[in-house]
Amino acid sequence: MPTLRALECLVAVLDAGSITDAAAALHLSQPALSHQLAALEREIGAPVVERLPRGVRATAVGRTIEADARAALAAAERVVGAGRAVAHGAGGQLRVACAESMTAGLLAPVLRTWLRRNPLVRLTLTETTSADELVRLLDSGVADVAIGPRPTRWTGAEAVIGVEEIVAVLPPGHVLAEHKSVSFDQLTSEPLVHYHPDHGLAGWLDAEAARYGMVPSVGMRTRQASTAAQLAAAGVGVALVPTTALGTGFRGTLRRMRPRVQRDLLCLIGTPSDVLVRPFVADVLRRGVPIPAAVHAAPA
């Protein structure tokens, strides 16, 4: 395979029409330039330039490969330019994965600020309903950074964003609204708006309930935490919902759990040294875990 240096020497010789002038333009000695041309000719199996009494000219082979040689050099320049642009934050691609319940409340404000500050960065977002699926996206190279609860297995770099609370969203006029907080015992006979079995929240909440000897009674299932909150607010049944899924405009009735049900939220970092990942993670950590107004308004 010819080197870029050999192609550069060929193009310089064709432009200058002289070994001497081409060597001077590239700041090479004439023997060094001739060595590069000889290596190129050995690779191809034919001469690329013809030595004349005064100067040189391209052979038929040299004329044939000249355009591709110039294109290869231009492509190499673009590679270097693109890399430098990313290194200075002027471009590139950032691939983010996020637990779907956290996209609107936690991640959206960070994305808005990030894209405004880095308009040349191509940002892709993949949502999942499982923390272990976030790990799969990182391990397979689909995502550079992932935001979600703690997975069952992760040995890479991570940063704790904060603690997220799970609250009970109640139908309008529900008897449990008379209480300042709700326990799992009080939900034993309540048909819950629960999550599909393949949703990470389903297994996690079942395990939390089991700690208090309670097996959730399922009235219906949904795949989205925000939908569970809306269904509960519409009177379908009680839902246990992460606060990040409520959104700033949520107006339903909610109560905190007793004792509090909480989980850590993390940035799982697949490429810690990436020049885009580092500042993005820093922005997410500065944002922290938002607490919607409805949670602030709930009885203490």
Task: Please identify what each model-predicted range represents.
Residues 191-212, 274-281, 288-299:
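Secondary-structure junction motif
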Residues 11-29, 45:
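Short helix-boundary/capping micro-motifs
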Residues 7, 43-44, 65-87:
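Alpha-helical linker/hinge and terminal dimerization helices associated
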Residues 155-166, 170-192, 278:
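Flexible hinge/capping segments at coil-to-helix
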Residues 91-153:
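Central regulatory/effector-binding core of bacterial HTH transcription factors
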Residues 41-63:
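A short LG(V/I)-centered, amphipathic sequence patch enriched
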Residues 131-134, 139-142, 149, 196-253:
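Hydrophobic hinge/microswitch elements
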Residues 155-160, 164, 226-273:
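Beta-alpha-beta core module
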